[in-house]
Every structure is written in C-alpha cells, then in structure tokens.
Curated annotation (Swiss-Prot):
GO cellular component, one term: chloroplast
Sequence similarity: Belongs to the GTP-binding elongation factor family. EF-G/EF-2 subfamily.
Keyword Ribosomal protein assigned: no
Task performed by this protein: Chloroplast-localized elongation factor EF-G involved in protein synthesis in plastids. Catalyzes the GTP-dependent ribosomal translocation step during translation elongation. During this step, the ribosome changes from the pre-translocational (PRE) to the post-translocational (POST) state as the newly formed A-site-bound peptidyl-tRNA and P-site-bound deacylated tRNA move to the P and E sites, respectively. Catalyzes the coordinated movement of the two tRNA molecules, the mRNA and conformational changes in the ribosome.
Keyword annotations: Chloroplast, Elongation factor, GTP-binding, Nucleotide-binding, Plastid, Protein biosynthesis
Keyword ATP-binding set for record: no
Protein name, as recorded: Elongation factor G, chloroplastic
Disulphide bridges: none
Length: 109
C-alpha cells in the first residue's frame, strides 16, 4: 500500500510512503529523476536523513519457467464500425496455455 507524499515539478519523481515496510521511497522512471529529486529542496516534505543506495528493481517471474514469449503481432484494417477481432494459432489454444482468454467477452476467437 503506497501513499504519495510529494511529487517533483515535472512529475517524474515521487516520494511514496510504503506502509508494508514503514519506509518512504523516492520513485522515478529513471535514475536521474531520483538524483534530481534528492537534490531539490522544494521536493522534500520534511528534513529527514536519507540512506541513499543503488537503485533497487524487483523482478518477479510468477508463472514459472517458460511464461515469457517472443510474440509477433500482425495488424490488418477492418471495416469502419466493425469493432475488433483477435485471432490466435489453434495449436496453442489446444495445449491450454492461454485458454483463460477464450471464453471471455471480447476474448480471443
């Protein structure tokens, strides 16, 4: 659970309070944004000591081995107002690797 305490003027960096770990975290899309936020006095919400270390990026693979794929997508024009249509190769569906998409409204056909 995160709460936003402060945001840099350009919106690139934020100070988040992480209640699960009782920590304030400087978040930025890139390392430079975090460094600039650290040096910008208008960015700080209070005078606190900061432990500055290397950026931490958490990578998690939740589906086990083989869940990531190299995908090729082909786009083709359709008649105006006809909506959208997704098609996939039948052998993949038969193996059950992505069967959770097939029976949902607007799902794969």
């Amino acid at each position: 659970n995160f709460s936003v305490f402060a945001m840099s003027a350009d919106g690139d960096a934020k100070i988040l309070y992480y209640t699960g770990r009782n920590k304030a975290i400087v978040w930025s899309g890139e390392e430079l944004g975090a460094k600039l936020a650290q040096e910008d006095p208008s960015f700080h919400f209070s005078r606190v000591e900061a432990n500055v270390g290397a950026p931490q990026v958490n990578y998690r693979q939740s589906g086990g081995q083989g869940q990531f794929a190299d995908i090729t997508v082909r786009f083709e024009p359709m008649d105006p107002g006809s909506g959208y249509e997704f098609k996939m190769l039948e052998p993949i569906m038969k193996r059950g690797q992505i069967n959770s998409f097939g029976d949902k409204p607007g799902g794969l056909k």
